[in-house]
Amino acid sequence: MTENIHKHRILILDFGSQYTQLVARRVRELGVYCELWAWDVTEAQIRDFNPSGIILSGGPESTTEENSPRAPQYVFEAGVPVFGVCYGMQTMAMQLGGHVEASNEREFGYAQVEVVNDSALVRGIEDALTADGKPLLDVWMSHGDKVTAIPSDFITVASTESCPFAIMANEEKRFYGVQFHPEVTHTRQGMRMLERFVRDICQCEALWTPAKIIDDAVARIREQVGDDKVILGLSGGVDSSVTAMLLHRAIGKNLTCVFVDNGLLRLNEAEQVLDMFGDHFGLNIVHVPAEDRFLSALAGENDPEAKRKIIGRVFVEVFDEEALKLEDVKWLAQGTIYPDVIESAASATGKAHVIKSHHNVGGLPKEMKMGLVEPLKELFKDEVRKIGLELGLPYDMLYRHPFPGPGLGVRVLGEVKKEYCDLLRRVDAIFIEELRKADLYDKVSQAFTVFLPVRSVGVMGDGRKYDWVVSLRAVETIDFMTAHWAHLPYDFLGRVSNRIINEVNGISRVVYDISGKPPATIEWE
């Protein structure tokens, strides 16, 4: 009997902040399970979830607007601790008898708050002290409205010159509100405050650890599928790889992985996937060489969106054909992760998150009546990687840079040809190899190369030649929503360019992309 790792749980109500998923990841990092729900949940749903504590997230709207989101009143009647963050604090204050007004000045960025009264939330936590010994906290503010009067049964815990109620508390009911974002790294003691709330005030044990998550997932897979056979599309990416390892541990040879080699992968990637999962880990893998089929379907197509659709359609066709060859397969496994579930669909309000399955593989034939197995659907990407390490997958594979689903199909601009893919594979391998040698690979968030379908004149020996142009791309980002181009050293870029032009016959010019996002996107197509 495995331990109930969901026993202690935090409910996070989402009011639309860009940081809400980060709040959930921070709670998980503390070893405590949590779920992220829309703000307009019912009392019955909260009761069924039975949280140990509730966090009200930030949000972009104004509590002073008539139809702005409100926490369900039951949140304050459930008898569990409640932690309001930014907008969450404002709606808590307003709903419990306080007052909120639009501020004359929007506070955005770094601020220092002074702790003026004792509270369980921040006791013993400080970044500095005032001249008269009061604790100071370095925090990250992002708000337009502010609380101008707290509910009568609350106390002021901390303030700034422009924000009189930076932290408020009702210690008896264990209600806390902060007018800053403890989940971001700019709030230096933010993680300690979240830990104080989750572990001490809500009294949650750290049961949510990689080893225990694996034990729980294996037990749940076995309970769900029993002795049935399962099929999985294995791409070699993080999600499908960790899904494969979990299923293999749970059901062994009853798992069949279908690896479709579409000819759009990185250099030697197909061989590496087959060697690692087949030879090393002993998984049952069906290898489908399908390069010609994909490239012939892509012939003559220049439009990026059309290329994506073609690659997706052909993959589904190939996967379906292989699935039909297998006998008695009852289940389809997919590497759906928690952000997929959260973002999957919106309710009529446009705010609520509706949980539904992501069909990563696409539509299976109607005659195949299969159940769905999604062992990662409660996990964030960083948790999936940690579980992968625990399962024995190599660090370099789990933490390598993102690679698009359509692969080189969207890194070869315009029409995709085998010649172009072969050149780009070699170019990309040189760039990545040099980044690793220079200890730069882990310092950038994503690096890759792009094939440009233009010829440029070059000089080789005594002759001139017209060959292809490639672009190097490297970016630094926290969330991939915005990104800066990476300021790689000139001597490094020169070394990479020299190697590519000298070692890859067919390339005459190397350029470096210095576009940020926005206005550019990270990928070119």
UniProtKB/Swiss-Prot annotation:
EC number: 6.3.5.2
Residues annotated for ATP binding in this entry: S235, G236, G237, V238, D239, S240, S241
Residue ranges of the TM segments: none
PROSITE patterns the record matches: GATASE_TYPE_1, GMPS_ATP_PPASE
Known partners and oligomeric status: Homodimer.
Pathway: Purine metabolism; GMP biosynthesis; GMP from XMP (L-Gln route): step 1/1
The protein, known as: GMP synthase [glutamine-hydrolyzing]
Protein role: Catalyzes the synthesis of GMP from XMP.
SUPFAM superfamilies recorded: Adenine nucleotide alpha hydrolases-like, Class I glutamine amidotransferase-like, GMP synthetase C-terminal dimerisation domain
Domain called Glutamine amidotransferase type-1: residue spans: 9-207
Gene field: guaA
Record keywords: ATP-binding, Glutamine amidotransferase, GMP biosynthesis, Ligase, Nucleotide-binding, Purine biosynthesis
InterPro entries for the chain: Class_I_gatase-like, GATASE, GMP_synth_C, GMP_synth_GATase, GMP_synthase, GMPS_ATP_PPase_dom, NAD/GMP_synthase, Rossmann-like_a/b/a_fold
Pfam family of the protein (one): GATase
Entry GO CC: cytosol
Segments forming domain GMPS ATP-PPase: 208-400
Catalytic residue list: C86, H181, E183
PANTHER family in UniProt: GMP SYNTHASE [GLUTAMINE-HYDROLYZING] (PTHR11922:SF2), GMP SYNTHASE-RELATED (PTHR11922)
UniProt organism field: Shigella dysenteriae serotype 1 (strain Sd197)
Catalytic reaction list: XMP + L-glutamine + ATP + H2O = GMP + L-glutamate + AMP + diphosphate + 2 H(+)
GO terms assigned for molecular function: ATP binding; GMP synthase activity
